[in-house]
Amino acid sequence: MSYKQEIKTIFEFNRRFIREDMTEDERNYWLQRFTMYTIDELTEILEELPFKHWKDYTDTEVDKEAILNEIADVLIFTFGMVDILGYDEEDILNEIAEKNQVNIKRQEEGY
């Protein structure tokens, strides 16, 4: 399955829970929840990394697969937020492409 099809599948799954007829208060409630879920997943990434500056981590290996798994969760919840706001997978992929071009230009100009 292509990545675009997989992203579409995520959006379709989210739509089982995210209704188009939600009130503004309901959208805000779910946007807040999905934001908290995303923050929780980001925190789980931090927990996979050595963080105690006083401890010697020279022999510690990071579980990159566990981190990749948490990043997948971050993206899934992020796509949920996109859906809650009324956008779809094409909207976010276009936004990512546009923002990436802005970021590249900024880096090239010494931003």
Language-model-detected regions and their locations in the chain:
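Flexible "arm" and connector segments at domain edges
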Residues: 1-111
